[in-house]
């Protein structure tokens, strides 16, 4: 069973929607939700371009291989597919962007900061939980804790730093509930 960021997001809104998304059901077409998705996709695209422009070309990677993440030389990556296994559950998240902060000393590991783009000016708890899900999947994939993440949002490109490690237990509970839901109905 695979729990993706789309399935996780659907669960935050409604367990039935989660079930439908996980089983591949097609949706009848909610005009508002389609508009919100289009706005978020457009915002993600433009903010990714803006963020990439802030880094030298040799420090940016698009869809890098996750196998060599710890040894990577880039400082910013976009469009990263993260996969991890927890018990019998597969987690999969499409990171909007990932910043790699090199270690300051030999004893400290390189820090990875997931970045999520949200077009709205006001963030919801769900936005923070989605970032925490990204960080949770990334931490399981790397085998180490991802403590913080960032959300870039709104007209002013406001950046919010989120302590994702503080939200990991809530993400784990939701992942377990999703797994239970999908196994009961499947």
Q: Model regions: which residues?
A:
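Nucleic-acid nuclease catalytic cores
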Residues: 86-176
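Metal-dependent nuclease catalytic cores that hydrolyze phosphodiester bonds in DNA/RNA
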Residues: 1-107
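Polybasic (Lys/Arg-rich)
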Residues: 177-186
